[in-house]
Amino acid sequence: MICVLVLQGYFGHSQTVTLPPSWTAAEQMASLLNEPKSPNRLQVETRTLIRADNNVLPLKLGDDERLPSMNFSDDYAYFANYRLKDFALSYRRWTLRHGYGKADFYDGNKDAAQLYLDSMSVGVDARKVYNVNASLNRTFLRRWTLEYAIPLKHNQGQISVALHWLRIHRLQKGKLTGQMWLGQFDGDLHLLTTRGLPSNEARGNGMTIDFSAVAPISRRIKFGIWGENVFSKIWQWNLQEITAKVATNKVEPDADGFLHAVPFLQGRIEKVSLKARAKRIWTIGAALQQGDNSWILMAKKERNWRISIGYSFPIGQRKQVWFMVSERPLLWQVAIITARFQFLLSVDKWNVATAKEAMTVVRYCWSL
């Protein structure tokens, strides 16, 4: 058990927190392909985003209690899970938005992934040495947004600035290092978590600013840039900081995504506060018009830069379809965009049994 409990008034950390996305790929594509609109009537919008992405195992197996035997061949392992649901009101240049979402991100080295796969399948190989290095970054929050759009060049482009106010209901950041050998795991755990605190103490606040600019640079080419969390500040007033020595012969994931160590876990808990910033995400894109059709080039920076190329064509008045393929790793995207409706589906493989990355976005709007 945890053997020392210390209460501390304030403790600062320089940390980066992962947040749900502000823009969807479908919205970014629509702004490149169409002229911006400032509704003269009150417009209502709702959107939903679900995304899961990893390089360890097929998504279909993610909730299975027992896995088939698998070998992990990469040097770096990760799992990302995002959910976003929000509701917006727009009038002319102003947009007011409210929603909630979560962002879960886990990463680690090759041995951390293999230890997880072995413990969930045939069992840990007692003769093998697993040198584990793993971390997690999780948030659940509500977000209020005020956005203002400035039209550019005869309303063919626009600059947008969005101010977000965050109410954080869950925050977890941690790191686990250690070695598994001869059926025994010995390591060090450092975890910042709101888990175990009363709900009124677990809440935090934050503020972020997003920026985007989309404008024509020639008669046929339009360029765009989107910056999420360009400026940000997050305050989590109450956290449990767990610093512990882990010694266990049983390995299984717990609710924090780390090890459930029974019965030996020695260390200390301190009550701390956290000042952090949100992780920045950058996207740049360009669309080359060819008659009614367009070629699209996009580059997005999350963990690394990911380049995508696509093609769009109309299927009716104010209706478009676009296809896109991304590299490293390969990702296929298809979307339908109309004046009121957007739907996007992206997968790395069309076979559900082997897909490791998938995203669905649905957006619908109407005027009052």
Where are these regions (language model features)?
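Bacterial N-terminal signal peptides
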Residues: 1-8
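Boundary of Sec targeting at the N-terminus
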Residues: 10-15
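A subset of solvent-exposed loop/turn segments in beta-rich extracellular surface proteins, enriched
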Residues: 16-199, 244-264, 280, 343-368
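Transmembrane beta-strands of outer-membrane beta-barrel proteins
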Residues: 40-46, 87-89, 94-96, 157-163, ...
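An acidic- and aromatic-residue-enriched active-site/binding cleft used to recognize and process polar
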Residues: 166, 228-230, 302
